Regions:
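N-terminal signal-anchor transmembrane segment
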Residues: 1-63, 85-90
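Alpha-helical transmembrane segments of multi-pass inner-membrane proteins
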Residues: 128-156, 169, 176-224, 228-242
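Membrane-embedded alpha-helical segments of multi-pass membrane proteins
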Residues: 42-60, 101-112, 184-192, 229-237
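Juxtamembrane membrane-water interface segments that cap and precede transmembrane helices
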Residues: 29-39, 162-177
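Alpha-helical transmembrane segments and terminal signal-anchor/GPI-anchor hydrophobic tails
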Residues: 38-43, 247-262
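Structural signal for the C-terminal ends of transmembrane alpha-helices
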Residues: 55-67, 92, 115-123, 194-202, ...
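Membrane-interfacial loop-to-transmembrane alpha-helix junctions, especially the N-terminal start
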Residues: 10-23, 66-80, 126-130, 205-209
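Aromatic-anchored transmembrane helix interface
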Residues: 78-82, 95-119
């Protein structure tokens, strides 16, 4: 009986890890126009995985308990509750359930990310997965720059959400899985600090994954977004300040002059 319980727990653990990885891949990589159109509601790939993961949580009391502990321990939940309250108030005034439902789904997705990171992947496992996803996006970004069309467009199953290519001053602006070049730029710069984490030394370093960092920088340039470039420059400066002493000096003598030239 104990051996059966052991294999059962191992099976549940493996299933949880598989769903966690699938959820994060869908959440970070797959476009919003990949899914199923239902009357009054688009069931995107992200929402499918959110639904499946929620059913997995609800199927066992211990998993529900761990999820709610993560929600309660989140320091931003008061601000999130206030935001949801405003959305609910707006939904009542507009008589449209989507005004409340869509922000609720986004917040639920954020809490699920916290849950799978704590319970199934851990910080090291999450960072390894994240770097692989970022590498995948950046390589496809280079392919898109050559094709002048995002490869994710071939996943369009919900018609009307894909906006097509973006061209400014004759130059094509890559957009990845997003619907706008600016949105893709935000995806890239939001992951930049995570890319520079050194798990072994527990510090920030720009040299830990330098080839991938350069790919991210090139992709940000190819988005053609000046605001995104400015934010990326600020991020690199802050990461330089947070780097170890000797590395900080080297970076200040290279990144700062390069930034001024750009």
């Amino acid at each position: 009986q104990s051996s059966n319980r052991y294999f059962e727990n191992c099976g549940e653990r493996s299933l949880g890890q598989f769903l966690s990885v699938s959820f994060l891949v869908a959440y970070y990589i797959l476009p919003q126009y990949f899914g199923i159109r239902l009357p009054g509601f688009d069931l995107t790939a992200q929402r499918m995985l959110i639904t499946i993961l929620c059913l997995f949580l609800l199927s066992k009391e211990s998993r529900k308990k761990m999820f709610w502990e993560g929600v309660r321990s989140c320091r931003l939940w008061l601000f999130m509750a206030g935001y949801l309250g405003i959305c609910f108030y707006t939904a009542v005034l507009r008589f449209h359930i989507g005004t409340f439902l869509y922000p609720f789904i986004e917040l639920l997705g954020a809490f699920l990310v916290i849950y799978v990171l704590r319970e199934y992947l851990g910080s090291d496992g999450f960072l390894v997965l994240f770097r692989r996803m970022l590498l995948f996006l950046c390589v496809l970004g280079l392919v898109e720059a050559v094709m002048r069309k995002t490869p994710f467009a071939y996943l369009e199953t919900i018609r009307g959400l894909y906006t097509g290519g973006m061209i400014r001053s004759g130059s094509y602006r890559i957009m990845g899985p997003a619907n706008h070049s600016l949105a893709y730029g935000l995806i890239l710069i939001s992951g930049l600090p995570l890319l520079c984490i050194d798990e072994e030394k527990h510090c920030f370093t720009l040299f830990r994954h330098l080839p991938l960092l350069l790919l991210v920088v090139v992709n940000v340039f190819l988005t053609g977004s000046r605001s995104t470039l400015a934010v990326m420059g600020l991020e690199l400066l802050l990461l330089t300040v947070l780097a170890p002493g000797e590395q900080r000096k080297k970076l200040l003598f290279t990144i700062v002059p390069a930034g001024l030239l750009i």
